[in-house]
From Swiss-Prot:
Pfam families for this protein: PapC_C (PF13953), PapC_N (PF13954), Usher (PF00577)
Keywords annotated in UniProt: Cell outer membrane, Disulfide bond, Fimbrium biogenesis, Membrane, Signal, Transmembrane, Transmembrane beta strand, Transport
Function (record text): Involved in the export and assembly of LpfA fimbrial subunits across the outer membrane.
Species this chain originates from: Salmonella typhimurium (strain LT2 / SGSC1412 / ATCC 700720)
InterPro entries cross-referenced by the UniProt entry: Fimb_usher, Fimbrial_membr_usher_CS, FimD_plug_dom, PapC-like_C, PapC-like_C_sf, PapC_N, PapC_N_sf
Membrane topology type: Multi-pass membrane protein
Stretch forming the signal peptide: 1-21
Protein name: Outer membrane usher protein LpfC
Length: 842
């Protein structure tokens, strides 16, 4: 029940007195012991017989009913929820000094962390029935802070489950609603080239569509990942994979059927089609969880960056001149080299390979992380055999900071066994060492046997130095990974038969320099048997700030055996804030002394800052000449759109993109920004146009729905609407809802809205007198709940009112202290959307 106390207009001091009295009466229980109704005796127009007992004491007469309250359990804040409160018994009043006590069921107490099994009376109680928890659990108590609408619960520690920090009870995990969904990302470009030093001229068109579609049915998630590419009239459609998955909560695991990839902690990850059961560490609280690649590079001009893995294009974006960073990849497997192509505006390309494998993490004592996979190897776009195989990976935390791990791969023509040991050495860092023995049957029935040795080290120092990964791996000439051996069997002339991996080293170091900024250093090297060359790359940079001016210096060096010379690029960037606009300067130079400079502005626009724009103008040496670009990126409630134009001496290009999602569910079809893995559908009937907090551009649509994307699975997330964005005929009982989605879930965040008119009504009795101050008025409507309190001179402000209806008015328990108002609202409104009305209470 919602009580609304609002001043009703500019009145005399007589009205001010009564309004002040009402506010004191409504708030007094939070601060004082009693409220004396004699305070109102000298206020003209107040019926001295009105029943104001509900305001007389903070220990007494708040009305029983349902209230939306914040919940605090043993000083830990939990999610807000609607709870029923009952009038306290005399024994409860004496014990806790409370007028209202919460009506809590066994299930609700368990959600709060109470150890139900320790109390037979709780264990035997019906799941949804109110229980006398304060009698059953010694020293248990509750306090309802009515003014703050907060329920404070206190239980002895022995009565509580021993849970890790950050634990969200499994009973709150929400599998979501049944729905169909599509997450799409489309990009295109149209270019025309007219080389200044030749007679060559041509047009080039390129399009790319990334689709992640699926269906949720209960706990099951059906997903398909497909891409479409069109380059200069040549179409390619790739069905990358289809899978059916669900959470296995008792095992803290994820079951997947169909296309997936094996774990990459011990062996190199490969794509497969079959069945997999793997630990899901997202189900663990943050305090018990113990590497996604970041790609850095430098673009000399407005460039297109493409990332491929396993011969699939998994990412494409357009970047401006200078150093760039890509940190939001979704690789198709947990390891596998990433091929990065930077296509400059003049058509030239830079290419480098970034080795990628996930870090073998140490496990907490007693924690088992595992993965079981069985099925058929998938070669992706490569022409290779697809043998059946099984793989097991396991890591277990031992005492004293040790972790033991191992695994096995079995196939008709291949087997591999691995074992290793990791140790957390505290100040020294974390180290792991493992060895893998493999035997392969290659082409022409040739057998090959060998070993691979791996060393990993990671450490963060108090000085701000962070070794995220320092690793070395060496393989003997007879060692083949499962993927290498399979490809060699498929093609005796494969490069793997002569050139397979020999050693690999990679390191990532970041050093924080406090007020002086930070530096980073990334290096990788990879070489192959029977090949003298080495594949190497180095990235280094410095980020700093002087006053409000940000600047950075970056250097990249890449070398591949098939290249005659290495690629070297040096860049400098500087940004100066000018309100909501930034002035930017970029400079890049390569090993041949060719220099490119760009000067421009960028910023955001619109109320939610959801329109990004940039304008750049540049000049290149060595005859490159002038260049420039204009880019817009809009993030709307139903999707995102981008548009860009750039030119140089050899031509011009227009690029554009659309990103978003569509969800079909029981309450409509809702368009969205890109969806991510887990998401929430807001349901707020009648609240069209309401803005979602912390989600720029997202608004409730005409059906009362909106999508909040990119929720973290198994983590509590608060979804909130901006009250000031509601129209004049909508009120919310609460402006925020907490949700806890499981992996891939589409959860419902339901807001209770009161849709109707805001009314300022002058109420008189049949005898012509005003309805007494302090009387309660309740809407008689089975579909709506709206109540308020009558002010001085019979003035009533109430929201959520229909055009026609009836109000029940009470100011006491006698029949003479009750009446009913039948009303039909007039059309006139003031400038705040409030309807003015007069009515007789009979």
């Amino acid at each position: 029940m919602t009580w609304t106390h609002l001043p009703l207009g500019n009145k005399t001091s007589r009205f001010t007195q009564s309004a002040l009295a009402l506010m004191i009466a409504g708030t007094l229980p939070a601060y004082a012991g009693t409220f004396n109704p004699r305070f109102l005796e000298d206020v003209p127009g107040i019926d001295q017989h009105v029943d104001l007992s509900m305001y007389e004491s903070n220990k007494a007469e708040h009305l029983p009913g349902k209230y939306r309250v914040s919940v605090v359990v043993n000083e830990k804040k939990m999610e807000s929820r609607t709870l029923e409160f009952k009038a306290a018994t005399e024994a409860q009043r004496a014990k806790m000094g409370e007028s209202l006590v919460p009506c809590l069921s066994r299930v609700q107490l368990e959600d709060m962390g109470v150890r139900i099994d320790s109390f037979p009376a709780l264990k035997m109680a019906p799941p949804e029935a109110c229980v006398a928890f304060d009698d059953i659990i010694p020293q248990a108590a509750s306090h309802f802070d009515f003014a703050d609408q907060t329920l404070i619960m206190s239980f002895p520690q022995a009565a509580m489950k021993q849970t890790a920090r950050g634990t969200v009870p499994e009973s709150q995990w929400d599998e979501g609603v049944n729905a169909l969904l599509v997450d799409y990302n489309f990009s295109g470009s149209n270019a025309s080239y007219d080389a200044h030093d030749s007679e060559t001229s041509y047009n080039s068109d390129s399009y790319y569509l990334n689709l992640r579609s699926g269906m949720n049915l209960g706990a099951w998630r059906l997903r398909n990942y497909s891409t479409w590419t069109r380059n200069d009239g040549n179409n390619t459609w790739d069905n990358i994979g289809t899978s059916l998955s669900r959470a296995i909560v008792p095992l803290k695991s994820q079951l997947t059927l169909g296309d997936t990839s094996t774990a990459g902690d011990i062996f190199d990850s490969v794509q497969m089609r079959g069945v997999q059961l793997t630990s899901d560490e997202e189900m663990l609280p943050d305090s018990q969880r113990g590497f996604a690649p970041v790609i850095r590079g430098i673009a000399k001009s407005n460039a297109e960056v493409t990332v491929e893995q396993n011969n699939y294009v998994i990412y494409r974006t357009f970047v401006q001149p200078g150093a760039f960073e890509i940190n939001d990849l979704y690789p198709t497997s947990n390891s596998g080299d990433l091929t990065v192509t930077i296509k400059e505006s003049d058509g030239s390309e830079q290419k480098f390979v970034q080795p990628f494998s996930s870090v073998a993490l140490l496990q907490r004592e007693g924690h088992l992380k595992y993965s079981l996979s069985a099925g058929e190897y998938r070669a992706g776009n490569y022409n290779s055999a697809e043998p059946k195989f099984g793989q097991l990976d396991a890591m277990y935390g031992l005492p004293y900071g040790f972790t033991v791990y191992g695994g096995a791969i079995f196939s008709d023509d291949y087997y591999s066994l691995a074992g290793g040991l990791g140790k957390n050495f505290g100040y020294i860092g974390a180290i792991s060492i493992d060895v893998t023995q493999a035997k392969s049957k290659l082409a022409n029935e040739e057998n090959s046997e060998g070993q691979s040795y791996r060393f990993l080290y990671s450490k963060s120092f108090n000085s701000g130095t962070d070794f995220r990964l320092l690793g070395y791996k060496y393989s003997t000439s007879g060692y083949y990974t499962f993927q290498e051996a399979t490809d060699v069997r498929s093609d005796a002339d494969s490069s793997y038969s002569q050139y397979h991996k020999r050693s690999q080293i990679q390191g990532n170091v970041t050093q924080q320099l406090g007020a002086w900024g930070s530096v980073y250093f990334n290096v990788t090297q990879q070489d192959y048997w029977n090949d003298e060359g080495k594949q190497r790359s180095l990235n280094a940079g410095y980020n700093g700030r002087i006053g409000r001016v940000n600047y950075s210096v970056a250097y990249t060096w890449t070398k591949s055996p098939e290249w005659d010379e290495s690629d070297r690029l040096l860049s400098f960037s500087m940004s100066i804030p000018l309100g909501r606009v930034w002035s930017n300067y970029h400079l890049t130079t390569d090993q041949h002394g060719r220099t490119n400079q760009q000067l421009g502005v960028s910023g955001t626009a619109l109320e939610d800052h959801n329109l990004n724009y940039s304008v750049q103008e540049g000049y290149g040496s060595n005859g490159v000449g002038n260049s420039g670009s204009v880019n817009l990126d809009y993030q709307g409630g139903v999707g995102s759109a981008s548009l860009g134009y750039n030119y140089n001496r050899d031509g011009q290009q227009v690029n554009y993109g659309l990103r978003g999602g569509v969800i079909a569910h029981s309450e409509g079809i809702t368009l969205s920004q890109p969806l991510g893995e887990s998401m929430a559908i807001i349901s707020a009937p009648g609240a069209r146009g309401a803005h979602v907090i912390n989600n720029g551009g997202v608004e409730v649509d005409w059906m009362g729905n909106a999508v909040v994307p990119y929720l973290t699975p198994y983590r509590e997330t608060e979804v909130s609407l901006r009250s000031d964005s509601l129209n004049n005929q909508v009120d919310l009982d609460t402006a925020s809802v907490n949700v806890v989605p499981t992996r891939g879930a589409i959860v419902r965040a339901r807001f209770d809205t009161r849709v109707g008119y805001r009314v300022l009504m002058n109420l008189t009795q049949a005898n012509g007198k005003a309805v007494p101050f302090g009387a309660t008025a309740t809407l008689l409507d089975t579909t709506k709940e709206s109540s308020s309190i009558v002010g001085e001179d019979g003035q009533l402000y109430i929201s959520g009112m229909p055009e026609k209806g009836a109000l029940q008015v009470n100011w006491g328990k006698d029949q003479a202290q009750q009446c009913r108002v039948a009303f039909t609202l007039p059309e006139q409104q003031d400038n705040t959307g409030v309807v003015m009305a007069n009515a007789v209470c009979r």
